């Protein structure tokens, strides 16, 4: 078994994305390369990253990140959102953009927060009439992105996160029915 860490776990070190309306008041302790060095010191096998951790998403920088991870023997996973505008828009990508970044850093996983908007708190709103059209749009995006993901060798994983029910994620997966479109069930949220 490999042990990785989501950079949000180092939020108090200035790493990871802003979340829940909280914006960091201090600079990150490490850049992406220092973070990888720290991961090795901690005995980790890999990191689950966002664009906030990468610092930049231009191709030259992403190649440097990939090379640095390979030199350190670390796996990388890429985490992005379809619409993180409410808390940290640095994380917002189309599925195709997220797949391209994941491929560039050598990640075989692109974990996606779907960012479903609900008319009221999550409790009792599974498959709410205002949610179903959003799920359908995500399914269409995933249908289009599936072949792109397969060509890139990146499995995309739709996450339930804090705003989707597992049944809703499975509904999308069953509609898409593509070997490179899967699920990340977050049992902590």
Question: What is the meaning of each model-derived region?
Answer:
Residues 1-107, 140, 178:
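N-terminal pre-domain/capping segments
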Residues 5, 47-49, 112, 158-160, ...:
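Conserved beta-strand positions
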Residues 54-57, 164, 189:
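Glycine-/small-residue-rich active-site loops that bind phosphorylated ligands and cofactors
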Residues 63-64, 68-76, 80-182:
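Active-site acidic/histidine proton-transfer and metal-coordination neighborhood
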Residues 181-189:
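Beta/alpha (TIM)-barrel catalytic core signal, keyed to glycine-rich beta->alpha loops juxtaposed to Asp/Glu
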């Amino acid at each position: 078994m490999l042990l990785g860490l989501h950079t949000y776990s180092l939020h108090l070190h200035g790493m990871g994305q802003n979340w829940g309306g909280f914006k960091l008041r201090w600079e990150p302790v490490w850049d992406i390369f220092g973070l990888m060095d720290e991961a090795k010191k901690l005995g980790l096998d890999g990191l689950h990253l966002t664009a906030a951790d990468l610092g930049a998403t231009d191709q030259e920088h992403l190649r440097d990140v990939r090379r640095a991870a390979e030199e350190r023997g670390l796996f990388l996973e890429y985490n992005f959102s379809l619409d993180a505008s409410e808390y940290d828009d640095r994380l917002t990508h189309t599925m195709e953009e997220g797949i391209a970044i994941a491929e560039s850093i050598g990640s075989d996983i692109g974990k996606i927060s779907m960012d479903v908007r609900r008319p009221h708190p999550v409790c009792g709103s599974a498959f709410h009439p205002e949610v179903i059209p959003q799920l359908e749009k995500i399914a269409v995006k995933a249908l289009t992105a599936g072949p792109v993901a397969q060509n890139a060798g990146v499995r995309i994983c739709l996450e339930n996160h804090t705003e989707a029910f597992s049944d809703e994620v499975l509904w999308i997966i069953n509609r898409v029915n593509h070997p490179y479109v899967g699920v990340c069930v977050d049992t902590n949220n």
